């Protein structure tokens, strides 16, 4: 069973202590206003996926193809749009809002991230 994911923003890091008093580093993530925009089906697209959007955008800030796709789906345009491949029993209807309640306590998750670009740093000095 492959479930849909969420788009989040990293807030920072902190530590949590277990019962033995050992500290564990944890990353704090903010779950934004994620909404399912649409779905990909095996019949039409060859794979099954949920299309999730985060942070509503003004019409002037998005490309015309994205605006047309959002209008067809009946949702507002979003700044960040991501597809999550899922199994056929985990398709979420378009227009459904996703939140942190999507997960249960103690559940393991896979995380993907984009690191901040630092540009060309030049030659290393001694």
What are these regions (language model features)?
Residues 1-126:
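Extended basic (Lys/Arg/His-rich) segments that typically form rRNA-contacting surfaces
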């Amino acid at each position: 069973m492959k479930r849909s994911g969420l788009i989040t923003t990293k807030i920072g890091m902190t530590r949590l202590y277990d019962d033995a008093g050992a500290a564990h580093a944890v990353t704090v993530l903010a779950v934004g206003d994620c909404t399912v925009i649409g779905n990909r089906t095996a019949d039409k697209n060859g794979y099954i996926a949920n299309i999730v959007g985060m942070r509503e955008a003004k019409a002037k800030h998005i490309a015309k193809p994205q605006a047309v796709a959002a209008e067809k789906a009946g949702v507002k345009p979003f700044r960040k749009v991501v597809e999550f491949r899922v199994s056929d029993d985990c398709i979420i209807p378009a227009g459904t809002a996703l939140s942190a309640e999507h997960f249960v306590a103690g559940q393991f998750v896979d995380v993907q991230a984009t690191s901040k670009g630092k540009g060309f740093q030049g030659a290393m000095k001694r």
